[in-house]
Amino acid sequence: MTRFDSIERAVADIAAGKAVVVVDDEDRENEGDLIFAAEKATPELVAFMVRYTSGYLCVPLDGADCDRLGLPPMYATNQDKHGTAYTVTVDAREGIGTGISASDRAATMRLLADPSSGAQDFTRPGHVVPLRAKEGGVLRRPGHTEAAVDLARMADLRPAGVICEIVSQKDEGHMAQTDELRVFADDHNLALISIADLIAWRRKHEKHVERVASARIPTRHGEFTAVGYRSIYDDVEHVALVRGDLPGPDGDGSDVLVRVHSECLTGDVFGSLRCDCGPQLDAALDMVAQEGRGVVLYMRGHEGRGIGLMHKLQAYQLQDAGSDTVDANLELGLPADARDYGIGAQILVDLGISSMRLLTNNPAKRVGLDGYGLQITERVSMPLRANAENLTYLRTKRDRMGHDLIGLDDFEAGEML
């Protein structure tokens, strides 16, 4: 097993102007980035980064700074499979040459981190790629973009970093993997940390959800306890329907049956046949009730896979004209799936869950969860009901979004799968 260094060492190194190596989830990019604070950028640091990485140097910033500096998205529809939020590229307007040298790029990076700079201080396009970090950092999105901003903040520096992927020295056509990254870090006296450890550190030292209320909820599936939560970042309210006894945040909640269900007004409340959300919610409540112990976490703000109710209705309009559920979102300039599960993970941890059997047909829900102190011991398939209205939708989820719906074509609309 690869040895990782402490988060405390990495933060101290960032504060001192050194670079660190940060690796992400093996089910995500499974790559390591060199990261340092943008305000500490020097020609030597940039040259070192260029030598050992792909050379596509990016500067993660928080959203407020992106807005202040006039940095719109590089492309209106973000099609990056990991949702990396690239903005327009820039160079410093004054004091540099062509913009590509290590000295020039270091100057641009420092200017991006300077709170007194403005949009007028940059030319576009340029040789440095700013990125917009998700508010909430790695607790909302377990990416290198957010890790860089978090590390800078934790080091009491401006929330701006510099990142680039480290290239393998064994096979220069590919990126370095964890074992090689450990050797690289040791050779150059750099700290090696994982985003999972950074998430765990922040989760231990910070809190981003608050428990508001708890009440008994009798349902047709049985009796549950509804535990209400509020996200501190955006004030969105979520509900965990708990069956049986859970141990609380300091207990041993292992192998708990869990469904993380995304809000769907049309399917859950109106009984729309265009999706399978309503039947999945009913099935999850029934399965947890029969288990006698478990959680159905109802995530608000996930309507239409995170695009919102009105955008979802607009997407339906495009689907009526022939687009599928993925293309409809993209045609609206929206991601195919804009959901994040960081807040949901914090709620599950607050309920005392340490490991779970996850009720889902979507393998992507597993990505990044380990970093929240949660282990998925089993993925439990959900029963679905296909019908004439949602059969195409289900096939699109299987074929284009990776949902595990093997054998869907063998069933006629209306039969239980």
Swiss-Prot record:
EC number: 4.1.99.12, 3.5.4.25
The protein's required cofactors: Mg(2+); Mn(2+); Zn(2+)
Gene Ontology MF terms: 3,4-dihydroxy-2-butanone-4-phosphate synthase activity; GTP binding; GTP cyclohydrolase II activity; magnesium ion binding; manganese ion binding; zinc ion binding
Superkingdom, natural source: Bacteria
Keywords annotated in UniProt: GTP-binding, Hydrolase, Lyase, Magnesium, Manganese, Metal-binding, Multifunctional enzyme, Nucleotide-binding, Riboflavin biosynthesis, Zinc
Binding sites annotated in the UniProt record for Mg(2+) 2: E29, H144
Amino-acid positions noted as binding D-ribulose 5-phosphate in the UniProt annotation, renumbered to this chain: R28, E29, D33, R141, P142, G143, H144, T145, E165
Active site: D337 (proton acceptor), R339 (nucleophile)
GO CC annotation terms, alphabetical: cytosol
Reaction it catalyzes: D-ribulose 5-phosphate = (2S)-2-hydroxy-3-oxobutyl phosphate + formate + H(+); GTP + 4 H2O = 2,5-diamino-6-hydroxy-4-(5-phosphoribosylamino)-pyrimidine + formate + 2 phosphate + 3 H(+)
Disulfide-bond pairs as recorded: none
Site location (Essential for DHBP synthase activity): H127, E165
Binding site for Zn(2+): C264, C275, C277
Residues where Mg(2+) 1 binds: E29
Location of region: GTP cyclohydrolase II: 205-417
Cofactor note: Binds 2 divalent metal cations per subunit. Magnesium or manganese.
UniProt GO BP: riboflavin biosynthetic process
SUPFAM superfamilies reported for this sequence: RibA-like, YrdC/RibB
Pathway(s): Cofactor biosynthesis; riboflavin biosynthesis; 2-hydroxy-3-oxobutyl phosphate from D-ribulose 5-phosphate: step 1/1; Cofactor biosynthesis; riboflavin biosynthesis; 5-amino-6-(D-ribitylamino)uracil from GTP: step 1/4
Chain segments carrying region DHBP synthase: 1-204
Annotated GTP binding sites: R259, V260, H261, S262, E263, Q280, E303, G304, R305, T325, T360, K365
Family: In the N-terminal section; belongs to the DHBP synthase family. In the C-terminal section; belongs to the GTP cyclohydrolase II family.
Entry function: Catalyzes the conversion of D-ribulose 5-phosphate to formate and 3,4-dihydroxy-2-butanone 4-phosphate. Catalyzes the conversion of GTP to 2,5-diamino-6-ribosylamino-4(3H)-pyrimidinone 5'-phosphate (DARP), formate and pyrophosphate.
HAMAP family per the UniProt record, alphabetical: RibA, RibB, RibBA
Protein's UniProt name: Riboflavin biosynthesis protein RibBA
Protein species of origin: Rhodococcus jostii (strain RHA1)
Gene that encodes it: ribBA
